UniProtKB/Swiss-Prot annotation:
Pathway assigned in UniProt: Quinol/quinone metabolism; 1,4-dihydroxy-2-naphthoate biosynthesis; 1,4-dihydroxy-2-naphthoate from chorismate: step 5/7; Quinol/quinone metabolism; menaquinone biosynthesis
Protein's UniProt keywords contain Electron transport: no
EC number: 6.2.1.26
Xref: Pfam families: AMP-binding, AMP-binding_C
PROSITE patterns assigned to the protein according to its UniProt record, in alphabetical order: AMP_BINDING
Top-level EC class as recorded in UniProt: ligase
Membrane-crossing residue ranges in chain numbering: none
Organism: Bacillus anthracis (strain CDC 684 / NRRL 3495)
Catalytic activity: 2-succinylbenzoate + ATP + CoA = 2-succinylbenzoyl-CoA + AMP + diphosphate
Purpose of the protein: Converts 2-succinylbenzoate (OSB) to 2-succinylbenzoyl-CoA (OSB-CoA).
Family, as annotated: Belongs to the ATP-dependent AMP-binding enzyme family. MenE subfamily.
Protein name: 2-succinylbenzoate--CoA ligase
Family matches, as SUPFAM superfamilies: Acetyl-CoA synthetase-like
Length: 482
C-alpha cells in the first residue's frame, strides 16, 4: 500500500491550474490562484514559528480565508485543530488547552490566555519567511483534529490522518460517481467533518465548490436553479426549507444528488422529493469515520424508508451485542471498520482502547441490519440530542447546571421542536431559591447558544433506578406530557 502522496492542492494546481476551484458569492478562484494564496500564508506561518507536527487552532467561519488557512497548515505539515464557532469562550479555551495548540488563527475578536492569536489579515499580509513546503503527504500523519462530545460530556479530539481523508473521498466517489461538470454546493460549516470533507473532494477530484459562507435557504434555492450545482449536502431541516421554496417546480435535470445526513428523514418528505424528481441519498457517518460511512442510494428512497443504506465500498459494518455479531433484524451496537476510520482520540488512550478494538470502531449507536444488509439506525447514542444537525450531549449541560450552587440535581433530555427537530429541556432539583429564568441565564454564560435548554422544570427528585442511575426515559415521558 502507498505510504505517501504528492501534496494534494499543489498537485491539483499543476494538473488543472486554470480550472475554477472555489466560487463564493461573485468571486471565482482557480486552483493555481488558491495555491498561490496558500503559499503566501505558509510564509507567514513559517515566520511566526509554526513547524511540522505542531497543532494550530482554527476558529473561522466558512470562507476563502478558512480554506486558505487549512491548506496552508497542511503545506507546512502542521495539524489543524478545527473549532466550532458556535461554542462559548470557555469551551473553546478548554479545547485549545486539551489539544496543546501553539497558536490560534481566527477571523473573530478572540483573546486567548497563553497562546498567540493571529487574524487572517496578519497571516496573509504579515512578515514572510521562505517556507519549507511539504512536497509529499504521509498518509499515516495527522492532518486534522476535530472535537466530538463523548457520552461523559467531555469533548474528545478525533485525529484524522491524510489517509483517512483520502479514503473518505475515494469511497464517496466510488459511491456517487464523478462527472466533469460536477459542482458541490458547500453550506455545512467546515469545522464539522461533513463540511471539511468537501474541501478534500474539491482538490482530489478537481471539482468546483460553490461556497456559502452562512446558511441562507433563499440563496441556496436560487443557486440550485441557476449556478450549475450538481450535488449538495443537507440535513432534514434544510431539505424542508428548500422544498417550501420550490413550490410546484423542480430542480434542473443536471442536479443529481441531495446528500442527506443528520438522522433519518420523515417519509412524507421523501415522497415529496420522489414526486418532484429530486434524488435523495441518505447517509450515516460521524467525525470518527471522516464523514459518511454508509449511504442509501436514491433507488431505495421509498422501498427502504428509514435506512441509512449500505457501507461504502472499502468499508465494513456489523451489529454486535455483548461482543457477539447478531443476525438480521436483531438490535445491537453499530460497529464499523475502514481506511476512513480514525485511529483514535488525542491524548485519550483509554477512550481509544474502549472504542476501537482490532480496527473496529464501536460507535455507541444502536441499530440493526435487514436481510439484505441495509442499516437502520435506531438511536444516535441513546441520550444524544440532535438539534438542527448539531450534536448535543445532555451530560455536558448537566455538568454546567450542577456547577450552580442552588442546583442539587440536574437531568437533561431532548424535546421535540418544529424548527430544529429537537432542543434541550432541563429538569432540576433545587438546593436553594432559584428561578427558571436565572437557570437559563446561567447556562447562556457557559454554553453555546444551541446547547442552552429551552425550558427548565423543577422536580422534588429526579427518577432513578436502584443503582441511582438517572432514568432519562422517564424524563422524556414528562416532556411528552407537557
Amino acid at each position: 500500500m502507498m505510504e505517501t502522496m504528492p501534496n494534494w492542492l499543489k498537485q491539483r494546481a499543476f494538473l488543472t491550474p486554470d480550472r475554477t476551484a472555489i466560487e463564493i458569492e461573485e468571486e471565482k478562484v482557480t486552483f493555481m490562484q488558491l495555491h498561490e494564496k496558500v503559499v503566501s500564508v505558509c510564509e507567514h506561518l513559517t515566520h511566526v514559528g509554526v513547524n511540522r507536527g505542531q497543532k494550530v487552532a482554527v476558529l473561522m467561519k466558512n470562507g476563502m480565508e478558512m480554506i486558505t488557512v487549512i491548506h496552508a497548515l497542511s503545506y507546512v505539515g502542521a495539524v489543524a485543530v478545527l473549532l466550532n464557532t458556535r461554542l462559548s469562550r470557555e469551551e473553546l479555551l478548554w479545547q485549545m488547552d486539551d489539544a496543546e495548540v501553539i497558536c490560534l488563527v481566527t477571523d473573530q475578536d478572540f483573546e486567548a490566555k497563553d497562546i498567540p492569536v493571529y487574524s487572517f489579515a496578519e497571516v496573509m499580509n504579515g512578515p514572510k519567511e521562505e517556507a519549507s513546503i511539504q512536497e509529499e503527504f504521509s498518509l499515516r500523519e495527522a492532518m486534522t483534529i476535530i472535537y466530538t462530545s463523548g457520552t461523559t460530556g467531555k469533548p474528545k479530539g478525533v485525529i484524522l490522518t491524510y489517509g483517512n481523508h483520502w479514503a473518505s473521498a475515494v469511497g464517496s466517489s466510488l459511491n456517487l460517481g464523478l462527472r466533469d461538470d460536477d459542482c458541490w454546493l458547500a453550506c455545512m460549516p467546515m469545522f464539522h467533518v461533513g463540511g471539511l470533507s468537501l474541501l478534500m473532494k474539491n482538490i482530489m477530484y478537481g471539482m468546483r465548490i460553490l461556497l456559502v459562507p452562512k446558511y441562507d435557504a433563499d440563496f441556496i434555492h436560487k443557486a440550485l436553479q441557476t449556478r450549475g450545482v450538481t450535488i449538495i449536502s443537507v440535513v432534514s431541516k434544510m431539505l424542508t426549507d428548500l422544498l417550501e421554496r420550490l413550490g410546484e417546480g423542480t430542480y434542473p435535470s443536471s442536479f443529481r444528488c441531495m446528500l442527506l445526513g443528520g438522522g433519518p428523514a420523515p417519509k412524507p418528505l421523501l415522497e415529496t422529493c420522489v414526486d418532484k424528481g429530486i434524488p435523495v441519498y441518505q447517509t450515516y457517518g460521524m467525525t470518527e469515520t471522516s464523514s459518511q460511512i454508509c449511504t442509501l442510494s436514491a433507488d431505495y428512497m421509498l422501498t427502504k424508508v428509514g435506512s441509512a443504506g449500505k457501507p461504502l465500498f472499502q468499508c465494513q459494518l456489523r451489529i454486535e451485542k455483548d461482543g457477539v455479531v447478531v443476525p438480521p433484524f436483531a438490535e445491537g451496537e453499530i460497529v464499523v471498520k475502514g481506511p476512513n476510520v480514525t485511529g483514535g482520540y488525542f491524548n485519550r488512550e483509554d477512550a481509544t482502547r474502549e472504542t476501537i478494538q482490532n480496527g473496529w470502531l464501536h460507535t455507541g449507536d444502536l441499530g440493526y441490519l435487514d436481510e439484505e444488509g441495509f442499516l437502520y439506525v435506531l438511536d444516535r447514542r441513546s441520550d444524544l440530542i440532535i438539534s438542527g444537525g448539531e450534536n448535543i450531549y445532555p451530560a455536558q449541560i448537566e455538568e454546567v447546571l450542577l456547577s450552580h450552587p442552588m442546583v442539587a440535581e440536574a437531568g437533561v433530555v431532548g424535546m421535540t421542536d418544529d424548527k430544529w427537530g429537537q432542543v434541550p429541556a432541563a429538569f432540576v432539583v433545587k438546593s436553594g431559591e432559584i428561578t427558571e429564568e436565572e437557570i437559563l441565564h446561567f447556562c447562556e454564560e457557559k454554553l453555546a447558544k444551541y446547547k442552552v435548554p429551552k425550558k427548565a422544570c423543577f422536580l422534588e427528585e429526579l427518577p432513578r433506578n436502584a443503582s441511582k442511575k438517572l432514568l432519562r426515559r422517564e424524563l422524556r415521558q414528562l416532556v411528552e406530557e407537557m
